C-alpha cells in the first residue's frame, strides 16, 4: 500500500516516543545556536580586536582550527573517556544535555570561528584606536559599532549551529542517555530495529524543522538588515 498516509508519523510520535526525541533535538539546537554563537564571537573578538599575549594567539588559532580535523566519532569517544572517569569533578555532566551542547559547539566551532573572524577583519581597526584615544570604554564600541556591523555574520553562525545540531549524529551518539535521546539518534535506532517507516518519518520532521528555522532566520535577517544595516546601501 503506497497511498499517502500520516499513520507512520502518528505511530512514531506515540509508540516510538519520537516526540520526546524531537523535543530534545530542538532544545539542543536552540541552546547550541545561542551559546555557540556567543562563545565563537567572544573567541574571535579576543583574537582580532584585543592586544597583548601575542605568544598565545598562534596557539589559540591552532586550537580553533583543530575541531575541523577531528572526526566526530573521535570527539565523542574522547568525551566518554574524559567525562566518564569517576574521579573527574565534571563527571556529573556525563549523559546530560549541557554536555551534548558543549560537544556540538566544539564539533562545529571552526566554521563559525572562521565566519566571524572574517567579519571582524572587515571592520576597520581604527575604530578601536579612536575609541582608545577618546577614552571611550571598549564595551561601548563593542555594542555600538562592532556588534551591529557583525549582525549578519552572527545570524549566519547561529543558523549554522541550529541546523548542524538538529542533524548531528557522529559525536553525540556516544553521549546521550534515555532522557536525552536526540531525533537524529532515534533515526539510527529505528533503522537498526527494522522500523524504516518511523525512521523516515522522523527524518522528514527533522528536515521540516530545519527548513522552518532557516526561513525564520532569513526573515529575521531581512528585518534586521532594514533596521540596522541601511548604512551599507548609502
Q: Each PLM stretch: what is its role?
A:
Residues 1-18, 166-223:
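Interhelical loop and adjacent transmembrane-helix boundary motif
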Residues 1-24, 86, 90, 94, ...:
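N-terminal, non-cleaved signal-anchor transmembrane helix
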Residues 36-39, 63-75, 93-117, 137-140, ...:
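Faces of alpha-helical transmembrane segments in polytopic inner-membrane proteins
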Amino acid at each position: 500500500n503506497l497511498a499517502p498516509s500520516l499513520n507512520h508519523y502518528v505511530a512514531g510520535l506515540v509508540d516510538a516516543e519520537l516526540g520526546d526525541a524531537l523535543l530534545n533535538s530542538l532544545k539542543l539546537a536552540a541552546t547550541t545556536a545561542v551559546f555557540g554563537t556567543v562563545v565563537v564571537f567572544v573567541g574571535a573578538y579576543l583574537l582580532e580586536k584585543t592586544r597583548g599575549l601575542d605568544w598565545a594567539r598562534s596557539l589559540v588559532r591552532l586550537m580553533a582550527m583543530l575541531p575541523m580535523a577531528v572526526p566526530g566519532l573521535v570527539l565523542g569517544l574522547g568525551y566518554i573517556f574524559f567525562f566518564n572517569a569517576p574521579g573527574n569533578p565534571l563527571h556529573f555532566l556525563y549523559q546530560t544535555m549541557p554536555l551534548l551542547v558543549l560537544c556540538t559547539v566544539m564539533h562545529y566551532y571552526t566554521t563559525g570561528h572562521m565566519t566571524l573572524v572574517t567579519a571582524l577583519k572587515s571592520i576597520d581597526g581604527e575604530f578601536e584606536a579612536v575609541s582608545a584615544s577618546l577614552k571611550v570604554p571598549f564595551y561601548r564600541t563593542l555594542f555600538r559599532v562592532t556588534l551591529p556591523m557583525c549582525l549578519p555574520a552572527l545570524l549566519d553562525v547561529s543558523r549554522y549551529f541550529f541546523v548542524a545540531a538538529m542533524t548531528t549524529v557522529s559525536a553525540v551518539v556516544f553521549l546521550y542517555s534515555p532522557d536525552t535521546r536526540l531525533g537524529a539518534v532515534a533515526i539510527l535506532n529505528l533503522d537498526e530495529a527494522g522500523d524504516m517507516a518511523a525512521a523516515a518519518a522522523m527524518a522528514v520532521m527533522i528536515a521540516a524543522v530545519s527548513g522552518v528555522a532557516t526561513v525564520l532566520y532569513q526573515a529575521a535577517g531581512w528585518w534586521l538588515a532594514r533596521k540596522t544595516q541601511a548604512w551599507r546601501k548609502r
